[in-house]
Amino acid sequence: MLAKKYTGKKLVDNIFTISRKAKEAIANHGKANVVNATIGSLYNEDEKLAVYSVVEEVYRTLPPEDLYAYSTNVIGEDDYLAEVEKTLLGNDYKESMKGLYISSIATPGGTGAISNTIKNYLNAGEKVLLPNWMWGTYKNIVLENEGVVETYELFNSNGGFNLEDFKNKINEISKTQESLIVIINEPSHNPTGCRMTYEEWKDVYTFIKGLKINLILIRDVAYFEYDDRTEEEKNKIRALILDLPANILIMYAFSLSKSLSIYGMRVGAQIAVSSSEKVIQEFKDALSFSCRVTWSNVSKGGMKLFAKIMTTPELKERFLKEKNEYMKLLMNRANLLMTEADHVTLKYFPYKSGFFVTIPIGPNVDKVIDDLQAKNIFVIKFNDGIRIGICSVPTYKIVGLAKRIKDSIDKF
């Protein structure tokens, strides 16, 4: 009975499967004796979900009409979308980006933003260019929309962004396609925590501005709140898009799941930036149509929560202060893991910020994972490496973790 395009499709979710094993181990051996590095949410040192006190306080004081009513607009609340744009593009973006057309739509999380973009800009049978180290759901979104997955090597031999392979893949696909969707997940890349430099971004934008095809660049910025770039550094990168040609569309995928630690509320946004008024009008027309027929509208409570915090100076200050403490916690955990990894010569991908550190293993990755599970250490497999969720592992459990991983690798 299934439609042909859905026949044979089945969700295989490695993350939830391993997480279930970790929970079983905790039930059998006690939480103190298990390292559960599978969780992709921010946890405190007591291994409980990190909840911002200001978020909890504001949410519980929202009026009922903001919590339980439909959104006043299919594309999202006006005050929410205005604050999303300021957060991503800078408070003065209307002045600094005067020559560009910008529009945004509320989505159910960052997943909704990416899915809604690919649905509307991908033709069946076309390739979508993804990084070879990536969040696996990207692939499923492409496949659901009858696309073909192509990957570029994320890292070069020096651990930097592999511009050469990125360019080669785009040039090759350009020979057979008039339009191409590309995803760059940065900063705080999932699963590696890597971050591109200003120079790397400059090289990317210089290259794509010279393309003849239509290029839709999805900037997955789900974890950007946990990046420690200064506002000056962010503005330098933002300025690189000021002279976009009309055939380039930048699409930011934003998520409140990470920004406010409200994963279950499913609130995000997609922000389109173009030098073409026509391109942005197409975005408004087509994507609002997709919103209405797919999820109708997004949680009004989550949107009002973000807008209230961001537009109230005292609340925003409290939020930023709490966020900085969590950023310090993440960096302390990451630095501890990397320092101990260096001591035992355990390789890892270059981490700058975010929730995860990834260790390349090689062909024995499955054996290593099994051996770690025998030690009650649970990690997530990515390609031929393992992802460590430093976001959820308390600092005391990170002590000695690098050596235990290295010992498992050295067995095979």
Regions picked out by a protein language model, each given a short descriptive name:
Residues N44-E45, F319-L372:
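Conserved PLP-binding catalytic core of the aspartate aminotransferase-like
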Residues G99-Y101, P350-F356, K381-I386:
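Short Gly/Ser/Thr- and Asp/Glu-enriched loop/turn motifs at secondary-structure junctions
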